[in-house]
């Protein structure tokens, strides 16, 4: 990489974009500093000296949000950044997906992309800056990379598409789309949307691609100026004689029939047996310790299996489980299978099964998000778990990994647009989707299961949502789009395109591909085929439960809303929270108070709610002119008596207002503790209350 500082500038969505090279992190293979508005991201690319054994490309993308970038000190005892949060993990995945397909086939060196957010401007996306930084760090390095790529955020407001909308614009946008690609094609899409049509989504994707092309041209100019010298990478060539011999054995032993085993576990077992038989043929003839030969035979076998699966789909239109390209696996749905939970849905599609379980909580049970932007209170959460037994395997039980976090977030994005507002449903909602079986499309099964759980729980959702995953097999001059892909089609195909939505439109999409990019024609056809599949699944789900239940579970908390004047909030809270804690301790409820005076009272027992409401009403009660009260004498003065109308509110009963008859001394007719009926005659500007008993006698 060049050691001389160079600065390159352009404009991006009305803001300055600057890329600097040659000054920072010079021991990395490639490093750039990206300045976008007031956002600053350092992106580096580093590769290992030697390749790694194995049949996968060891690429790692990291995205680190430094709290100092937003002028914050991290919370917690240690006061330093810990492991990446969910948003940082999702951004790392977002950057990984468009970059990964653009490395040479067979490249096995460890590659690590590091993105450090050094300064964060909420209106100048650090995520998109990091994507460009990652592309540039690779492009100016000696690492072989077939980029550059770029990514943009697209919004949709009042029928117009916007590149990189501001925080304020995102709040009113019907679309939050991230799209990435290179000059010739799109190779990554991720979006959440408010029932966007397929055509609107298609236009948004390619509106974004126009800006991507300009950004790629800008990066290419930088590369041409720097002229990095790339590592020479020569892929390992197969022994063609060995390939032909292994291929002949697979045909002899019935590879086609083995692939066309409809049951996943049986197919996997049959393929393992076939591979073992063929490998044994070579072990019998060669040195049994010749591990290199055995590895080579296994690698050839894996390639031949992939080629056969793709040939069957592309040429014979037969899928491994016997389905047609647009056919969905058998469906089954159930609700209400867990008696003590607040809502549950079981969704099964072929050999993929998800159990989604819903819990309702008070508004105070929200998740607090404290990242580089303002603190956010999240009242809808979807979590996804993928245990080892779901694919018949054993292994250590760990905290959720990147994949589980990503699938959970995709489901959350697909469902959040149908969740009712706080005013209509004052609850925090958490759904956990447990994948019990998996043979592909488990994230979409979790979306379907979650919709069932929402309706089973009685959540008044705006519309049901279903999800489906689309696949793709390309040939030189043709392509085949697959509906509802299974695991083998995902692993050996060219695309995993997940689409979720209602009957009216899309609420979330996510596209991963293993080829350079997709044309407009393929994306358009995939979206339409996904729409038909989504509606078929939706119709099945609605046969199980067609609308939300009218009542919540008996075990769900009840939430009652009441409103007080904002200036009374401090009375309910009390000094240092004393009064509100007393209410909670006495009644056992959860209290959430909004700044506008709205109070949410939550508890399982209605009697607890009623008692809390009574206490709050007593605290916030106000005297009204013309109303009568049974008052208690609290203090006597020469000029009258102070009487208590209700807790926290006293009134002056002037001596002239005690009786229509003349009174010399207050003590002649009243003593402390006496009860007397009074009428409120005046409340002055300072809130002082004057009362009269005489007015009731006249």
Curated annotation (Swiss-Prot):
It catalyses: RNA(n+1) + phosphate = RNA(n) + a ribonucleoside 5'-diphosphate. It is an enzyme of class 2 (transferase). GO terms for biological process: mRNA catabolic process; RNA processing. Its cofactor is Mg(2+). Residues 557-616 form the KH domain. Mg(2+) binds at residues 490, 496. Pfam families: KH_1, PNPase, RNase_PH, RNase_PH_C, S1. InterPro entries: ExoRNase_PH_dom1 (IPR001247), ExoRNase_PH_dom2 (IPR015847), ExoRNase_PH_dom2_sf (IPR036345), KH_dom (IPR004087), KH_dom_type_1 (IPR004088), KH_dom_type_1_sf (IPR036612), NA-bd_OB-fold (IPR012340), PNPase (IPR012162). One of its GO terms (molecular function) is 3'-5'-RNA exonuclease activity. Its EC number is 2.7.7.8. GO terms for cellular component: cytosol. It is found in: Cytoplasm. SUPFAM superfamilies: Eukaryotic type KH-domain (KH-domain type I), Nucleic acid-binding proteins, Polynucleotide phosphorylase/guanosine pentaphosphate synthase (PNPase/GPSI), domain 3, Ribonuclease PH domain 2-like, Ribosomal protein S5 domain 2-like. SMART domains: KH, S1. Residues 626-694 form the S1 motif domain. Involved in mRNA degradation. Catalyzes the phosphorolysis of single-stranded polyribonucleotides processively in the 3'- to 5'-direction. This is Polyribonucleotide nucleotidyltransferase. It comes from Staphylococcus aureus (strain MRSA252). The lineage of its organism: Bacteria, Bacillati, Bacillota, Bacilli, Bacillales.
